[in-house]
Structure formats: C-alpha cells, structure tokens
C-alpha cells in the first residue's frame, strides 16, 4: 500500500549512517536469508516475513532476536533491507550476531492485498489501521517465538510502525524484551490540521511525489548532495516493484 509518509526511505539512509561503524565487522560474515509467507487468522491473508542471521547459527537468546515493521507508506523490505554500498541495515545488524526479521503487514510489500485494494480507494474505509497492523505484527511475533523456542524478542517500529509496535507491546508486554521506537510519527513541530482529510481504503503515491517529500524542508544548497547518486532510483525501482498494479495505476 503506497501511502503518504514518504520520508521513510530518507530515514533509511540516516539509519545506514548510524550503522556505518558495523560495516567492517559485517564485511566477512556470511548470512543465511529465508523468505516465508505465514498465515493469519483471516482467510486468504498471508504475511511476508524475511529472516537473516549468521550462517550456521540456529540458537539465539531473546536479546539477540529482532523483528522490524515498516511505516505507513513503504514495505519493510525496501526500508530495512535495501543494500546501500553493498549492505543493508538488516545485513549490518545480522552480522553482529542477531537473528533479524522483517514483516510486511497486509496490503504492503509481498503480503496479501485485501480485496478492497482491487477497487477504487474511495469505495471503502481504511482497511489497515493500527489495530489491524498490530494484529499482523503479533502473528509474526508468535511465528518467531515458536520457531526459536523463546518467550520474548526485541521489536522495532519505524514511523507509523512505532504505533504498531507500541500498541502491540502495551497488550503483550511479556513477549517483548526491548521496544525500539525509531522516528515516531507523533513527534511534530507544527500543529495538526483543524480537520483531517477523509481517507479511503488506501492511498497512491507517485515516484515524483516521493522524491519531493524526501527533499521537503531541505535547504536548496543541500539538496544536490543529500541523496547519494543512484540511491533514490534503486529504492524507487525496488519499492514500486512490490506493487503489482503500480504500472497500470
């Protein structure tokens, strides 16, 4: 589901900078990658889960297991596992000995798109609100707990994903070792609008509008150097390829 919070990808670049210090250690660590579709309690809805960990390692303590979830616009895969200079944020964390997972909630990335997404957005109410996202996130948590034989894990949300993991943790505290809130969307420097626009089932975002949002509020003399050459194009290509209808909309 391509929506409006287009700054997530820019935050991905910032996160990559945060983990630059891990690069040397990550360089020679071989990782195992597994992609899985897991069922939910709703008929026909499956969730995409990716796992990366050091090759040959199958036992992990709860404090070494991490599940990440995306924000309101783009899927986890291209926010958390897009290689920049050869490594993604997910790669760098896994290379430090972590068992790292990402999940796309329904309607995003490779996860099942609800049938309402085949209809015009104005025909239905929002279909993936925070309560639904938290439910899907919990499905992924339970999958990992069972797979690794542990009782709790670390969880991380990005942007709107902080609301998802925050809600989940408030109701399932015993299953969470540590809660990481990265770039919470409720931290604002301007007052909210007096009236929010009416939302449909989903929202559409173009590549041009995504780039514009990345560069919003950036001083003109800084814009040319903000995004490394080719990074936006690589991210946009990978992101829009996750939407099977992006070419025809």
Model feature map: region roles:
Residues 148-187:
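Conserved hydrolase catalytic core segment
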Residues 121-148:
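Alpha/beta-hydrolase active-site loop
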Residues 76-79, 103-125:
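Glycine-rich "HGGG/HGxG" loop immediately N-terminal to the catalytic nucleophile
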Residues 27-61:
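N-terminal cap/lid segment of alpha/beta-hydrolase-fold proteins
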Residues 56-102:
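Short, surface-exposed "cap/lid" segments of acyl-processing enzymes
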Residues 1-10:
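Bacterial N-terminal signal peptides that target proteins for export
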Residues 190-249:
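Alpha/beta-hydrolase
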């Amino acid at each position: 589901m391509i929506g409006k919070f287009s700054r997530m990808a820019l935050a991905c670049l910032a996160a990559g900078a945060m983990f630059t210090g891990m690069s040397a250690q990550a360089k020679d660590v071989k990782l195992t990658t597994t992609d899985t579709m897991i069922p939910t309690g709703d008929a026909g809805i499956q969730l995409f889960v990716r796992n990366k960990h050091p090759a040959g390692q199958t036992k992990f303590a709860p404090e070494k297991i991490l599940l990440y979830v995306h924000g309101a616009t783009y899927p986890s895969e291209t926010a958390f596992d897009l290689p920049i200079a050869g490594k993604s944020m997910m790669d760098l964390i896994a290379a430090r000995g972590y068992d790292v997972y990402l999940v796309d909630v329904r309607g995003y990335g490779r996860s099942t798109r609800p049938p309402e997404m085949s209809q015009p957005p104005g025909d239905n109410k929002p279909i993936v609100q925070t309560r639904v996202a938290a439910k899907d996130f919990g499905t992924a948590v339970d999958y990992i707990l069972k797979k690794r034989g542990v009782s709790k894990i670390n969880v991380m949300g990005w942007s709107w994903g902080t609301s998802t993991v925050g809600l989940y943790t408030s109701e399932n505290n015993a299953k969470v070792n540590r809660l990481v809130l990265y770039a919470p969307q409720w931290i604002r420097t301007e007052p909210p609008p007096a009236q929010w626009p009416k939302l449909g089932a989903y929202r559409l975002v173009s590549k041009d509008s995504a780039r514009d949002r990345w560069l919003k509020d950036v001083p003109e003399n800084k814009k040319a150097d903000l995004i490394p050459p080719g990074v936006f194009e690589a991210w946009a290509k990978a992101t829009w390829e996750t939407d099977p209808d992006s070419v025809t909309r």
